[in-house]
């Protein structure tokens, strides 16, 4: 796939682990980072995603940046790579991401018999309930493992 140079800028999302890029450079709002070289998805260039949910799967940390990408660019299914990426704004989104994760879990809570403490934590985000919810989740995981062991033993070839 050949990179295309486009005068059009694309707004995208990028996550970092703290206020530093993977190469150790500080993440500076307002700065345009440039890459000199061939762009190749997953290998070289400055990466970002058009949708934040796609960017999350590549996120090394909780700091989210809204970026504007330009220069030579390649578009993939869930990310892009470019030679110019300007940081428009950035902040530590841990609270937002935790809230989003709890809402996603609540969307499917009806699919299992969740312990009440887990449901309460997911609904409230109360950090005091978090350790208890984790313990209840671990107990449920252990029970599921016992069930799986039993089923695998019963279903094994004889």
Question: For the regions a protein language model found, what residue spans apply to each?
Answer:
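Short, glycine-biased loop/turn motifs at secondary-structure junctions and
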Residues: 1-158
């Amino acid at each position: 796939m050949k990179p295309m140079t486009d005068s059009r800028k694309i707004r995208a999302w990028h996550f970092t682990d703290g206020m530093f890029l993977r190469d150790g450079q500080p993440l500076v709002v307002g700065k345009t980072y440039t890459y000199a070289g061939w762009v190749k998805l997953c290998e070289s260039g400055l990466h970002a995603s058009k949708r934040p949910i796609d960017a999350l799967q590549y996120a090394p940390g909780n700091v989210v940046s809204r970026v504007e990408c330009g220069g030579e660019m390649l578009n993939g299914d869930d990310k892009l790579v470019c030679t110019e990426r300007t940081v428009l704004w950035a902040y530590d989104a841990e609270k937002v991401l935790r809230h989003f994760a709890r809402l996603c879990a609540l969307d499917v809570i009806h699919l299992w018999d969740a312990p009440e403490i887990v449901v309460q934590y997911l609904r409230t985000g109360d950090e005091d309930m978090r350790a208890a919810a984790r313990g209840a989740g671990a107990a449920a995981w252990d029970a599921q493992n016992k069930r799986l062991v039993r089923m695998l033993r019963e279903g094994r070839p004889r």
